[in-house]
Swiss-Prot record:
Source organism (scientific name): Saccharomyces cerevisiae (strain JAY291)
Membrane topology category: Multi-pass membrane protein
Gene that specifies this protein: HXT4
Any Pfam family: Sugar_tr
Protein name, per record: Low-affinity glucose transporter HXT4
Transmembrane region(s): 67-87, 123-143, 150-170, 181-201, 208-228, 243-263, 347-363, 370-387, 395-415, 438-458, 476-496, 498-518
Residues modified by glycosylation: N425
Cell compartments where the protein resides: Cell membrane
Amino acid sequence: MSEEAAYQEDTAVQNTPADALSPVESDSNSALSTPSNKAERDDMKDFDENHEESNNYVEIPKKPASAYVTVSICCLMVAFGGFVFGWDTGTISGFVAQTDFIRRFGMKHHDGTYYLSKVRTGLMVSIINIGCAIGGIILAKLGDMYGRKMGLIVVVVIYIIGIIIQIASINKWYQYFIGRIISGLGVGGIAVLSPMLISEVSPKHIRGTLVSCYQLMITLGIFLGYCTNYGTKTYTNSVQWRVPLGLGFAWALFMIGGMTFVPESPRYLVEVGKIEEAKRSIALSNKVSADDPAVMAEVEVVQATVEAEKLAGNASWGEIFSTKTKVFQRLIMGAMIQSLQQLTGDNYFFYYGTTVFTAVGLSDSFETSIVLGIVNFASTFVGIFLVERYGRRRCLLWGAASMTACMVVFASVGVTRLWPNGKKNGSSKGAGNCMIVFTCFYLFCFATTWAPIPFVVNSETFPLRVKSKCMAIAQACNWIWGFLIGFFTPFISNAIDFYYGYVFMGCLVFSYFYVFFFVPETKGLTLEEVNTLWEEGVLPWKSPSWVPPNKRGTDYNADDLMHDDQPFYKKMFGKK
């Protein structure tokens, strides 16, 4: 039993919804960093076992869903940062096909027409990902220095500065390019701090759902971005692209205003000595009085956590490479999950959807993009339910398998049936419609599984002591792959057309096996329990059977989950 669990029992607190907050997790982090406490933890464990029957546990009660409306609205406001990024993704896909944008930032043919070269298109679309990667690593530290809430406000302001530079661009493509980099810095900070703050203020039994709302907001932003492009496409001047950019400015201001009503992370408040505010934050999230004994006990646990962290000193970058505490293994897993989210191929459709569906012969590819945006947004609601109903691991496995099937059909039809008489002799309408249908199936599978769940997994996995650093690195991997896919897609598509889909198919097959062998199930666990699961070295494919130490019966054998003398593949293919 961890030091925190022993402390909780000694203070008559066990398994409260507030355990889902990162501050609770941090005590386990301090235990990771101060192994000299082991003897003390063992003594406390013996004490608890001798007094377990006499303890009267105080817990913050689980309430009906209607009781969590306030915390849900607050988390949606934090998740609105995802809307900002989704808006950019949805609008840029249309900008590169709009006449005024091409005339201002493109190059001129000998016949007087304008065009965007593949290099310039790739850079203007994907460079925001480089800004995001840098911003996530550098600006996420603001959340540790000034609080998650103030850190979010600062990075949104940086995003606004980038938007202003883009709007002010007249005919210099590199000015627009610089503006997108600066906006990317802000979006990168948002992508780390938004899920982090949501996970720290959410009750444990709805944490996965509320963190998934970040992805829901991304899909809403993409959809409304598509709709705005459709509404401005008939204009022949800069209204085509400046109005969507101006609305992006307005959305960012709206988020800043909404953040004033969001509670700060209780852990940060305790760390800076604002105990009463920490009580109010926990009480607001769990719909109880700030004077409730369970809230007061929870704050005491957080205080003990903060003191333990201070004794251990500041976390260094070197700690993220610790294999003894399994931090490095978690970092590799988080980085892989975020990378594989991009390698599923979703941004192939989101960044270049308008261009792709022009290629399949559709007369109005902007309308098709709107349809895809609706499918993506509506499907994410299903994903919010699935993540808590079936768990993170099972959803990722089924998502990878179903997306593989959809991508095989999409690519095969594009390669063999789209141009029956050659690429220059027109496309088959039936084949094009088939590709659209399976693209919708693909987006449904993506939106319900691989779109929201990587954010959930990363927000739950890392010890609080190194959480901001690890989340920033993992998210940076996502952005870097986003840049590579966004930049090279025009070249690859031009060279191999829809054979490109087979590349994503291979990545999806790899994703399935990676999740099976390396991603544990964390559904229904507090952040501290997730930490214990990793410390115990539970095999990922056995993790759904894992039980936290304070809930185990006498017949529970934890060793059975830590090794597999005859795994399924040996049983299937080995000698009988």
